Amino acid sequence: MMTAANTHAIGSLDANGQKATLRKWLLFGLAVVTSCAWHVFPVSAEEPAKEPAKEPAKEAVVTDSTKKDCRYEGIGEKSNGGASGMELFPENDLFRPLWADPKQPQQFMSVHATQVRGPQRSHFNMWSVGFGDNFGLVGKRNGCNGWQVGILPAVFAQFDLDSGSTDLINADYVVGIPVSFRSGLFSGRVRLFHQSSHLGDEFILNNPGVTRVGLSYEVLEAILSLDAPGGWGRVYAGGATAIHVTPSDIDPNSVHWGFELRGPTMAAPLLAKPMPGTRLTPVFGSDFQAFEELNWTINTNVIGGLEWSKVGSDRRLRLLVSYYHGYSPYGQFFGTKLEMVGGGVYVSF
């Protein structure tokens, strides 16, 4: 039987139990709320700081840094940065070489069926080779406008293919100082050069009737050129005078003119796919010269063919056929009338 004291004790226990139970539920609820808050609102101080999201890597932008050969491309263009300072050993030239001129310093090998015109007509096959170029020493440019001074070494040699040992017939040696300039579509070249000519020893031995001439001269020449917009063609004209000639009785003056045409440039068939950037351009030109010593008779060279080049390169290779009619352009035979038909490989740097 329960006593009053027991009843009071049980009541006290119930009250205490209820308080303890309530306290447990409060602690449990606090733990749940704290746990939820921990996951929903994480404490930044205890969580490692996240790195800022990185932007996706951008692909490298390939810019067209292809340089332009001012002899053929970018004619008359100005630089966005304005005029540059003096430049040592400038690349290529501002004046396009007169590649239809038989005596243009360049690298070539050609074969010609040659007819000597005159009372005693004769025919032979000639191999003609040339080595030379315009090497820029110093210049100043604003894009493709400006001026340049260089040095000009060259040799031109002709061989008799019908002889048993391919005898050297004649060799012309040239060295000079060219000054070239360009302003828009106008360009020009002034040259002071020396040329000496020599017969081949085998040719003299096999032709005892031939007399060697000690031919040499120093010439001052000037040529002006006007390009068509876009560089598809040009005309040029000028003249020269010999300031010293051996033999001294040779008349000194000459005139020189011509034109060039360039067809549309296209991807080179068969080559553009395995070698990207290879281009093909049809080319044609005619060069005319007349000399006071030869009574101003017009000497004509007509030449044309195909030119291969590469984007961003100064190098060009041409396969050309040609027809020449007039006095010989080769020193020791300058008074001999020739007619030549042939073709060859021409390389430009």
What kind of region is each of these model predictions?
Residues 1-81:
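Cleavable N-terminal export/targeting peptides
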Residues 55, 59-180:
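Transmembrane beta-barrel domains of Gram-negative outer membranes and organellar outer membranes
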Residues 69, 144-261, 325, 334-337:
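Outer-membrane pore/translocation modules
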Residues 86-101, 295-349:
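Predominantly the C-terminal beta-signal and adjacent terminal strand-loop region
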Residues 95-103, 136-149, 227-234, 263-282, ...:
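Short loop/turn motifs that connect adjacent beta-strands in outer-membrane beta-barrel proteins
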Residues 109-113, 151-155, 190-194, 237-241, ...:
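Transmembrane beta-barrel strands of outer-membrane/channel proteins
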Residues 120-126, 163-165, 244-253, 289-300, ...:
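Solvent-exposed loop/turn segments connecting transmembrane beta-strands
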Residues 131-137, 177-183, 222-226, 257-263, ...:
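Residues on the lipid-exposed face of transmembrane beta-strands in outer-membrane beta-barrel proteins
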